């Protein structure tokens, strides 16, 4: 079967389970053989599991156990000490650590159900989902490794080259460009209206030289982000969340937090509502204008910040008393979440159009949501306070 064919580099992770075009473990070398802290994941058998594919991507094959690595056995794969290898090891470690922290916070004995899949041409993924826990209505944490091919014009556009009829400005027409992409993507929907939803996603993208241009330079990008979507504003929680993001950013460049916060506010914008999806966080995309090792460490730091940014908030709010009115408002805000993901999120929409793995693509959606005709919260209410903050993003920290 032919490899994947994408239209732009930033869409590569749309082939990954649940990926969005926004959006990670120890930062250093090491083997791609990783351990999972939870060790209690329920695995779904390969039999009876239906998969979906189209001409855009290879059909995935269910696996009963995660392999030591999803990387191809070539010079840039397993055992090479490459960024690819370290990034895969990182996202798989983070997946295990986040799932373990969520299971502990849930406290019900509920466990993540795991699906493992691979593709014949290399790559694969691990989808983990917890539903109907005591604390979490639905929580998905997915990792994936994708190999494919993108059109040469997309490759040249990423390099800033101009040309006509598929030809580079200074050379003959080039062939399709092989690529590698890996990422972790997660959305966490708690039951309590006072406990916020969290989304995070971190990814790495890299090209190989086309067959007809073996000496062509390799291109690479990092992308990612972590953002918070509460139904009610509890400033202690929002400030804590943003302060953890800022601390992670400041370790590498003090300009990162203000720059990536604004990027986040701009990206998660529901145009037809004139609202942001939530109260932001950080977001960056196609980042390659810094040292590669520095950005690998930065993505790692951001992913390692997920648990300390989120779990303390969950512990404070998971047992907060609430009313039916609070729950109804949460469901309305969940509706906004659905609208953004299905209408605007580039990874979700691309995955739906190209026959991606549907269960993984839609794992970001909440288990329940609500749409109420012409609903507007009254002035002076806590609900209105949240809506105003989504319409007019604010600075949560003194910079």
Curated annotation (Swiss-Prot):
GO terms for biological process: chlorophyll biosynthetic process; protoporphyrinogen IX biosynthetic process. Residues 20-39, 55-81 are annotated as: Disordered. PANTHER family: COPROPORPHYRINOGEN III OXIDASE, MITOCHONDRIAL, OXYGEN-DEPENDENT COPROPORPHYRINOGEN-III OXIDASE, MITOCHONDRIAL. GO terms for molecular function: coproporphyrinogen oxidase activity; protein homodimerization activity. It is found in: Plastid, Chloroplast. The keyword Lipoprotein does not apply. Involved in the heme and chlorophyll biosynthesis. Catalyzes the aerobic oxidative decarboxylation of propionate groups of rings A and B of coproporphyrinogen-III to yield the vinyl groups in protoporphyrinogen-IX. Residues 1-52 form a transit peptide. It is an enzyme of class 1 (oxidoreductase). It comes from Oryza sativa subsp. japonica. Homodimer. The record marks 272 as: Important for dimerization. Its EC number is 1.3.3.3. InterPro entries: Coprogen_oxidase_aer, Coprogen_oxidase_aer_sf, Coprogen_oxidase_CS. It catalyses: coproporphyrinogen III + O2 + 2 H(+) = protoporphyrinogen IX + 2 CO2 + 2 H2O. This is Oxygen-dependent coproporphyrinogen-III oxidase, chloroplastic. Substrate binds at residues 185, 201-203, 355-360. Residues 129-138, 337-372 are annotated as: Important for dimerization. The lineage of its organism: Eukaryota, Viridiplantae, Streptophyta, Embryophyta, Tracheophyta. Belongs to the aerobic coproporphyrinogen-III oxidase family. It comes from the Eukaryota. The active site is at residue 199.
């Amino acid at each position: 079967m032919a490899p994947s064919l994408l239209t732009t580099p930033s869409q590569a992770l749309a082939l990954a389970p649940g990926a969005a075009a926004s959006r990670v473990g120890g930062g250093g070398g090491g083997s791609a053989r990783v351990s999972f802290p939870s060790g209690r994941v329920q695995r779904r058998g390969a039999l009876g599991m239906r998969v979906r594919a189209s001409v855009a991507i290879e059909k995935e094959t269910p696996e009963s156990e995660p392999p030591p690595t999803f990387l191809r056995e070539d010079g840039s794969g397993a055992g090479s000490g490459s960024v690819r290898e370290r990034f895969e090891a990182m996202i798989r470690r983070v997946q295990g650590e986040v799932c373990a922290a969520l299971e502990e916070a849930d406290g019900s004995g509920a466990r993540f159900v795991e699906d493992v899949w691979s593709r014949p041409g290399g790559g694969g993924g691990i989808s983990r989902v917890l539903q109907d826990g005591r604390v979490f209505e639905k929580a998905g944490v997915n990792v994936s490794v994708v190999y494919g091919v993108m059109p040469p014009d997309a490759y040249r556009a990423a390099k800033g080259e101009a040309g006509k009829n598929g030809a580079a400005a200074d050379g003959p027409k080039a062939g399709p460009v092989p690529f590698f992409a890996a990422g972790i993507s997660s959305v966490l929907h708690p039951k309590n209206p006072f406990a916020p939803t969290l989304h995070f996603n971190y990814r790495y993208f890299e090209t190989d030289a086309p067959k007809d241009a073996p000496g062509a330079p390799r291109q690479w990008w990092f992308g990612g982000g972590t953002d918070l979507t509460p139904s009610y504003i509890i400033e202690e929680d929002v400030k804590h969340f943003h302060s953890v993001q800022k601390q992670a950013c400041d370790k590498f460049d003090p300009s990162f937090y203000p720059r990536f916060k604004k990027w986040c506010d701009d990206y998660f914008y529901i145009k037809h509502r004139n609202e942001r999806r939530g109260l932001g966080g950080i977001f960056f995309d196609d980042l390659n204008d810094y040292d590669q090792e520095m950005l690998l460490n930065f993505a790692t730091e951001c992913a390692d910040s997920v648990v300390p940014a989120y779990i303390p908030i969950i512990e404070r709010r998971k047992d907060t008393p609430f009313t039916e009115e609070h729950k109804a408002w949460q469901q309305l805000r969940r509706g906004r979440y659905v609208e953004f993901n299905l209408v605007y999120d580039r990874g979700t929409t691309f995955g739906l159009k190209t026959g991606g793995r549907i269960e993984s693509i839609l794992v970001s959606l909440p288990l329940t949501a609500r749409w109420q005709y012409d609903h507007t919260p009254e002035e002076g209410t806590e609900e209105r306070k949240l809506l105003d903050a989504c319409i007019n993003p604010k600075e949560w920290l003194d910079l």
